[in-house]
């Protein structure tokens, strides 16, 4: 799940894993996957493509989404074969049948991803590890946590937070404008911070587990065990994409352009707010000046003096001071 939209179209911005469908489905085909679970469906763009892919070969699709939106519920109505698990991933992974492949695109922080990987590994260790494809292993989530609901993360596993944080490439802190997240880590980098950090730590602690990175559309991490029956087939698919320097440069340019558009949209929004404030103040000033010139105001001031023993509730002098004029 991506940042707040700030008036920029989500599909155009490239938030959905559906933009990496060619790589995803090539990997699924290489493993001969007959069951796929998707963690985090958002608006269902990838879910719809997964269902179309599954229909061609008779595969089963499970979507794990604790708060399914109307698009997902509509897909369930249209496709009774789609299994919807309305639970947090850490709960669902304890009891669902471990599929042949998992696509992980849920809450993008170290704790959540580490726990998802741990739970999968506990139930399918070694060469039984399913194919894992994880989104947002590139900037900004590679080395920085973001949170949908920080209170669900144990305090000792939360980074210091900033609300409505604006993130910009090359800035390890936060900026005035950029890709804006409701909750993000105050700083980029360091231990136990970010999606890619979580995956690298998982891979480093386990023999025979490999990681490839497709550096496009916020980055796709592909994890598999080298002793899996389909390991060589997966390697053949992903090696040309893995950390491809041309793709890395293209993604850097794409992100820079996207951030600039976000910044421009936010600055235009701020200008519009200032314009409305000026209009409101001008209207208030016009009303106050009309009041000063009215006989009704003069009578109201005199009546107030009489009722308040010579100390009226309001006076011309007070209104003039409010207008910035000498009393």
Regions found by a protein language model. Give the residues of each.
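SAM cofactor-binding core of SAM-dependent methyltransferases
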Residues: 14-93
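Conserved acidic residues
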Residues: 34, 100, 130
């Amino acid at each position: 799940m991506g940042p707040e939209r700030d008036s920029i179209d989500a599909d155009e911005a490239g938030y959905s894993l559906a933009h990496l469908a060619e790589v995803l489905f090539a990997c699924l085909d290489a493993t001969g996957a007959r069951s796929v679970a998707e963690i985090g469906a958002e608006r269902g763009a990838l879910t719809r493509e997964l269902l179309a892919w599954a229909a061609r070969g008779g595969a089963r699709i499970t979507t794990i989404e604790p708060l399914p939106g109307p698009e997902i519920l509509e897909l369930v109505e249209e496709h009774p074969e789609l299994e919807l698990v309305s639970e947090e991933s850490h709960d669902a992974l304890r009891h669902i049948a471990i599929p042949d492949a998992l696509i992980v695109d849920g809450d993008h922080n170290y704790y959540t991803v580490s726990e998802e990987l741990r739970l999968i590994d506990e139930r399918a260790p070694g060469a039984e590890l399913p194919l894992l494809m994880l989104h947002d292993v590139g900037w900004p989530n590679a080395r920085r946590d973001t949170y949908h609901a920080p209170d669900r993360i144990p305090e000792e596993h939360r980074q210091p937070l900033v609300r409505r944080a604006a993130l910009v490439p090359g800035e390890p802190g936060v900026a005035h404008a950029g890709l804006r997240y409701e909750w993000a880590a105050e700083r980029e980098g360091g231990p136990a911070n970010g999606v890619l950090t979580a995956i690298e730590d998982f891979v480093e602690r386990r023999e025979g587990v490999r990681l490839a990175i497709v550096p496009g559309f916020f980055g796709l991490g592909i994890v598999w065990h080298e002793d899996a029956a389909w390991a060589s087939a997966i390697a053949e698919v992903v090696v040309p994409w893995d950390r491809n320097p041309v793709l890395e440069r293209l993604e850097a340019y794409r992100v820079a352009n996207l951030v600039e558009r976000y910044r421009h949209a936010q600055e235009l929004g701020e200008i519009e707010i200032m314009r409305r404030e000026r209009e409101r103040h001008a209207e208030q000033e016009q009303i106050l000046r009309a009041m000063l010139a009215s006989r009704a105001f003069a009578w109201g001031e005199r009546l107030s003096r009489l009722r308040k023993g010579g100390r009226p509730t309001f006076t011309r002098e007070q209104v003039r001071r409010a207008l910035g004029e000498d009393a």
